[in-house]
Amino acid sequence: MTTLNRSELLFVYDAQDCNPNGNPIGDNRPRRDPDTGQGIITDVRLKRYLRDQLQDDGFDIYVKKTEGRSHTRTKLIKDVLGGVDDADDLEDLGDVAEAFLDAATDVRYFGSTLSFEASDKDEDEAFRDALNSSLPNNYQGPVQFLPSKSLNEVEENEEYDSLTSVISTGEGNRQGGFDLDDKRIKYGIFPFWGLVDNNGAESTNLSQADVERLDTLCWRALKNQTTSRSKLGQEPRLYVRVEYEEGNYHVGGLQNLLELGDDSSESLRSVKDVVVDVTELVETLERVADRIDTLHVVGDGRLELDIGDETIRADEFWSHLSEAGHDVHEIDVLNERDLA
């Protein structure tokens, strides 16, 4: 297996008049830091978008719902392996771990726990024993993200807080109604930081093609998986994958190198009010340029970026980095997408 280069990911997206990540133990209100007021989106939420997009692209995934229902790990592994129902079927596979990782695309990225539930049936127990002897207790995913905190303090839109839905009887009469908890933020812009660990990639068979797939997967997942009523209003704005030369080096914490520019509006309501200052990011990339192999970049022209005294559109960021001497790959999200 080819040794991968280590990569850092910086993925910025925004959320307008929606609930980007409700807290189920907090009345499903949008997550916020109680001290700073910053909005929060968990890495779990982002990974769910990515898994769902992988599945829509035709790739098998392990962690999923089928027909809207959650299932046991035993049911999930039978589903992802396809045609495997008992211990004899597992034996016919030969190398079970290789077959599982080949099929479970999401596990190659994010890892998973593989403890299987006990059963009173002898046949099921034999299957569980065969699984446990063939697979580790867990795979640690080589692709990980930190939860994201918004660059701005977010406000909850109280106008959406209580909404009454009226059901029609079909005879022109309105019958009853019920309240919908509709808790949304006015606007937030969220930078995610992630790491592709070249060492951990070997344990899950993460391939070069898998890593390159991230360059379009993240963008398209935000476009395609945020179409429900409460999630609509999220858009990808900037994606940068810093692919390093061989070795175990990375800068770390690229999200902390971004801040709101001075020309941002005092009260943010849409991307038109935002300027993101990427000066420190650009300076950092220049400082470690001899350690960087390639910068993989795509941006949305509706987001403005400050670099020193210059303001550019995010879709021009790749060109700015190229002119600064970096080897830059301008990502074509649609033409480079990888479908199964």
Curated annotation (Swiss-Prot):
Keywords: Antiviral defense, Cytoplasm, Plasmid. It is found in: Cytoplasm. The keyword Cytoplasm applies. The keyword Acetylation does not apply. Pfam families: Cas_Cas7. One of its GO terms (biological process) is maintenance of CRISPR repeat elements. Disruption phenotype: Loss of the 8 Cas genes in this locus (cas1, cas2, cas3, cas4, cas5, cas6, cas7 and cas8b) leads to loss of CRISPR interference against plasmid targeted by this CRISPR locus, i.e. plasmid is not destroyed by CRISPR. GO terms for cellular component: cytoplasm. InterPro entries: Cas7_Csh2/Csh2 (IPR006482), CRISPR-assoc_prot_Cas7/Csh2 (IPR013419). CRISPR (clustered regularly interspaced short palindromic repeat) is an adaptive immune system that provides protection against mobile genetic elements (viruses, transposable elements and conjugative plasmids). CRISPR clusters contain sequences complementary to antecedent mobile elements and target invading nucleic acids. CRISPR clusters are transcribed and processed into CRISPR RNA (crRNA). Plasmid targeted by CRISPR locus P1 transform wild-type cells very poorly. There are 3 CRISPR RNA loci in this organism and a single cas gene locus. A CRISPR-Cas type I-B system. Component of the Cascade-like complex (Cascade I-B), composed of Cas5, Cas6, Cas7 and crRNA. This is CRISPR-associated protein Cas7. It comes from Haloferax volcanii (strain ATCC 29605 / DSM 3757 / JCM 8879 / NBRC 14742 / NCIMB 2012 / VKM B-1768 / DS2) (Halobacterium volcanii).
